[in-house]
Amino acid sequence: MMWWALWCAVVVAAGSGVAAAPAPDSLSPLDMVQMDSSAPDDETLYAMSPMAARYSAGAPWLYLLADMPRDSQTGSGRVKRRMPSLSIDQPMSVLRQKLSQEMERKQQAFRAAVNRNFLNDIGKRGFQWTPSVQAVRYI
């Protein structure tokens, strides 16, 4: 934990030393009075953003940003994929539904077989007229 505090102190000290000394090849400072006109002329009215009403004429960066084309302001670093996110919820619910339908079909077939056997044992279906079949049946 101590190294982190030491690192922060070194970065702050180095930053203050760099900011105090002007660079030899630096640009000349901007004349803010020239850019800060209280009444913009008709040519720049189209370039004023809707935020210009909120900020007074003391914000010349609004004019500079409004003059830039819109596509240059957006970063084209990463292209977002347009596919929907992958999820297993829908396929799993479909599989669960198919499994429950298959189990219900098997239970229905089993119940139909039990009913068929029950109906074969009672009434006319269960009575055999030939004695040889009855003898084989009960032996």
Swiss-Prot record:
Report the superkingdom from the record: Eukaryota
Organism, scientific name: Agrotis ipsilon (Black cutworm moth)
InterPro entries the record matches? Corticotropin-releasing_fac_CS (IPR018446), CRF (IPR000187)
A GO molecular function term, named singly, is: hormone activity
Q: Which residues would be cut away as propeptide?
A: 21-79
- Please provide, in alphabetical order, the Gene Ontology terms of the cellular component aspect for this entry: extracellular region
Q: Where in the cell is it found?
A: Secreted
Q: Which family does it belong to?
A: Belongs to the sauvagine/corticotropin-releasing factor/urotensin I family.
Q: Where this protein primarily resides, as one coarse class?
A: secreted
Q: Which residues form the signal peptide?
A: 1-20
Q: Which UniProt keywords apply?
A: Amidation, Cleavage on pair of basic residues, Hormone, Neuropeptide, Secreted, Signal
- Which GO terms are recorded in the biological process aspect for this UniProt protein? neuropeptide signaling pathway
Q: What is this protein called?
A: Diuretic hormone 41
State the SMART domains in the record: CRF
Give residues where Isoleucine amide occurs. I122
